[in-house]
Amino acid sequence: MLYYFFKYIDRFSHIPGIGVFKYISFRAASAAILSLCISIFLGKRLIIFFKTAQIKEGIRELDLAGQSEKAHIPTMGGIIIIAATVVPTLLFAKLKNVYIMLLLISIIWMGLIGFIDDYIKVFKRDKKGLAGKFKIVGQVALGVIVGITLIFRDDVVIREFGSNITVIENGQVTINDYKDVKTVKTTIPFLKNNELDYSKLIPWLDSKYMWIVYVLFMIFIIAAVSNGANLTDGLDGLTAGTSAIIGTTLAILAYVSGNVIFSRYLNIMYIPNLAELAIFCTAFVGACVGFLWYNTYPAQIFMGDTGSLAIGSVIAVLAIVIRKELMIPLLCGIFFIETLSVIIQVGYFKYTKYRYGIGKRMFKMAPLHHHFQKLGFHESKIVTRFWIVGIVLAILSLVTLKLR
């Protein structure tokens, strides 16, 4: 909103400093600072309100150290992250940008699904919360929206550079050094010729049906990352801190992929209008860091499914629109290993029960962070070490820009 306001003012006046709103770097920094302030300011007041209203989730007895102390801590803190991300984005971003619209839809939609889940747990006293099938329906709906938008919107393109490229637009023939291409290509990390075209994955499938395969893949990615973030949210500060690290990396990737100079220098896919996403990313990072102010050990508030489902969907959609979704197992390695530990635990238990009649466990408890708790590690040490691993994975993800 402020972008359009100051653009309008600048058209009729020459007030010094107004032109700075044209720069993405300034608006991204402003969004980060504002989101941090909003989350800290709003967090303090919501904690008081939630405690007064007894908005807290029942704690399952898992025989973990310090578990009983968390019974009185309010939940639904994801509202803080969502508000602190959405408000700065509305103020500083170009709201007509298709990528900004997709991310706003994603965080609000999955935040609403998570809110309903938390509401049922808190006010209906049902520890199961929203039935899993309804969460899946929400994730599928978001995947369909994202997939169809990226395929059928005319302004979602990549720009290919060359020399003397003939471009036909509106019946006019021009010679450029680039052309905008409507494609479903993505990036494969660590490979020299690192572009993968989804339309060539199934060569025997008619091209007019390729969008169905693409949408199904988008649904899988969004569901996987969203549930991964949800599983990771088991220790104070773990999901928020990890998400801030991932969000910072995605902000850098969005900016360089949407900047013609950096993209050509790094020889990566250039996506017009994508750099605007850096504003959403920095707002998201600021919101997560501000939430950590109250969520680090010992936590004063939990994000609940309101936060974890929204965070996971945002990270997934960001990776998809930046065309870095195949990097998710590396960049979101913490979410990935937490999810994998649950799959291994359940699968191994079922296998041993079927084979030997007695179910055995691979880990002392899943997800993986609870395994380390059972081994006697303090909660804050586990979280800090997971953050360190997350930082290393983020650096490796950025290294893929040049290492091929």
From Swiss-Prot:
Primary location recorded for the protein, binned into one broad class: membrane
Signal peptide: none
Keyword Transit peptide in record: no
Protein name: Phospho-N-acetylmuramoyl-pentapeptide-transferase
Documented EC number(s): 2.7.8.13
HAMAP family: MraY
Spans through the membrane: 30-50, 73-93, 100-120, 132-152, 209-229, 242-262, 274-294, 301-321, 326-346, 381-401
Pfam families: Glycos_transf_4
Reactions that this protein is recorded to catalyse: UDP-N-acetyl-alpha-D-muramoyl-L-alanyl-gamma-D-glutamyl-meso-2,6-diaminopimeloyl-D-alanyl-D-alanine + di-trans,octa-cis-undecaprenyl phosphate = di-trans,octa-cis-undecaprenyl diphospho-N-acetyl-alpha-D-muramoyl-L-alanyl-D-glutamyl-meso-2,6-diaminopimeloyl-D-alanyl-D-alanine + UMP
Keywords recorded for this protein, A-Z: Cell cycle, Cell division, Cell inner membrane, Cell membrane, Cell shape, Cell wall biogenesis/degradation, Magnesium, Membrane, Metal-binding, Peptidoglycan synthesis, Transferase, Transmembrane, Transmembrane helix
GO CC annotations on file: plasma membrane
Cofactor: Mg(2+)
Membrane topology, record value: Multi-pass membrane protein
Molecular functions per Gene Ontology: metal ion binding; phospho-N-acetylmuramoyl-pentapeptide-transferase activity; UDP-N-acetylmuramoyl-L-alanyl-D-glutamyl-meso-2,6-diaminopimelyl-D-alanyl-D-alanine:undecaprenyl-phosphate transferase activity
Pathway, per record: Cell wall biogenesis; peptidoglycan biosynthesis
CDD domains according to UniProt: GT_MraY (cd06852)
Location(s) in or outside the cell: Cell inner membrane
Superkingdom: Bacteria
Keyword presence, Metal-binding: yes
PANTHER family named among the record's database cross-references: PHOSPHO-N-ACETYLMURAMOYL-PENTAPEPTIDE-TRANSFERASE, PHOSPHO-N-ACETYLMURAMOYL-PENTAPEPTIDE-TRANSFERASE HOMOLOG
Top enzyme category: transferase
Protein purpose: Catalyzes the initial step of the lipid cycle reactions in the biosynthesis of the cell wall peptidoglycan: transfers peptidoglycan precursor phospho-MurNAc-pentapeptide from UDP-MurNAc-pentapeptide onto the lipid carrier undecaprenyl phosphate, yielding undecaprenyl-pyrophosphoryl-MurNAc-pentapeptide, known as lipid I.
Family of the protein in this entry: Belongs to the glycosyltransferase 4 family. MraY subfamily.
GO biological processes: cell division; cell wall organization; peptidoglycan biosynthetic process; regulation of cell shape
